[in-house]
Design a protein with these regions (language model features):
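Proline-centered loop/turn at the N-terminus of a beta-strand
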Residues: 12, 145-149, 172
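N-terminal beta-alpha lobe that positions the nucleotide/phosphoryl donor
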Residues: 198-226
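Short, small-residue-enriched loops and turns at beta-alpha junctions
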Residues: 124-128, 155-157
Length: 226
């Protein structure tokens, strides 16, 4: 019974407090996802595969990038790195690596099938967030106007003032890939429910209008035999 009521009213459900906290942080930023799915930027092939494995259980839709996006990414990536989503864009490193990472994230977000994006990078000692991550987020959000998030596998012991500052600026920092994927799924569910609700309201309006017109119609004696 609860499931039916929750589906009808668009109630979002989570399994624990960590997932709830992640959802609250993600929903608190001003931009909600529109059409499309999730794109992710990584600096580790192993971590990229970890996200894919975890996503198999949660079934969060990942963006299938277009041929045009694939071509643009290939021109940015070091040899041997596949132009796919989720994307491991960290090759040999070097002084140009931050620019490559930022450009790759922009390219992913500008794909027509991308609704939101995540930079999945780990924190440093004492939960430090490296300042070099910030341009990836800022450039991606400013160019695409889509929600973006900085995601780490775990917070660790300690806290980062920068994490709070970025979150308040609309660039939320989320700890835990599972928590982030759950939050992403809930954002997509909320988006889809809003579309369904609008369609349902529109249908009710049409029905009300039709019923109203039928009552406004003058009935003469001949109509009573129809």
């Amino acid at each position: 019974a609860y499931d039916a009521v929750f589906r009808h009213y668009g109630v979002l459900r989570v399994d624990d407090m960590d997932q709830m906290a992640a959802c609250l942080i993600m929903f608190s930023q001003a931009t909600l996802p529109k059409h499309g799915n999730l794109v992710c930027l990584h600096d580790s092939g192993g971590e990229r595969q970890l996200l894919i494995d975890l996503d198999n259980d949660l079934s969060v839709p990942l963006t299938e990038i277009s041929a045009d996006t694939e071509t643009k990414l290939s021109s940015l990536l070091d040899p041997g790195l596949p132009a796919v989503n989720p994307l491991d864009a960290w090759g040999a490193g070097g002084t140009n690596a931050p620019e490559v990472m930022a450009s790759c994230f922009e390219t992913l977000l500008l794909d027509q099938s991308a609704a939101m994006g995540a930079v999945v990078h780990d924190r440093g000692p004492s939960s430090e967030i490296y300042a070099s991550y910030i341009p990836y987020l800022e450039r991606g959000k400013n160019l695409s106007k889509k929600p973006v998030f900085l995601v780490s596998n775990r917070q660790g012991s300690g806290e980062s003032r920068l994490a709070v500052e970025l979150t308040h600026k609309g660039l939320p920092v989320i700890d835990g890939i599972n928590q982030f994927l759950t939050g992403t799924k809930k954002m997509f569910e909320y988006r889809d429910f809003q579309k369904l609700y609008k369609n349902r309201s529109k249908l009710k309006s049409i029905k009300s209008l039709s019923i109203g017109k039928s009552f406004d119609k003058k009935i003469d004696e001949r109509d009573t035999y129809d």
